[in-house]
Amino acid sequence: VVDAGVPLFCVDMVPTSDTLVWTQVGVDEAEFGRLQAEKLAEVLPENGTVCIAMNQLGTNSQINRTRGFEEKIAELRPDVTIIDEQPADSKTDKAMNLVEDWLQRFGADGINAIVCQSAMTVQGVVEALRAHDLLGKIYVAAQDFTQPSGTEWLETGATYVDVFYDYNALAKGVYDTILD
């Protein structure tokens, strides 16, 4: 890419190479985590507990969404404890397995909220909680879940908050950047 003089545009990712010249089109990933923390801070009980189902380790979204959540929840609710953080890798089945593991380790009463970093993770978390009749009993903070069931889940209490990711605006930003 460098030797050929081909421009590199990164959509929603930040390359780790120091030798590449690139343009990134994306969002403030930490803001996603901060928004989730702000909403959960309003409802978590005193000394509440949270598990985070993260995106793939080392990705811009995983690092910054996690950091944003951790910093904001510590600021707003220092009594809240993040009891576990594990990668779900944006996979529904992996998220379901995480919830099963957390329920075994901490019990249903030991988890007050689960923070999700992608739509597929949300789907797995909700399905696992549904299987244990825990929807609405453990808060779910969602991200990116724009599919029709996402709205239904907010309305029925399966999820408590969903931070919207405007993919149309992202696509327009990429298009405009390439044309510049």
Predicted regions located by residue number:
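A residue-level marker of the well-folded mature domains of exported/periplasmic proteins
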Residues: V1-D180
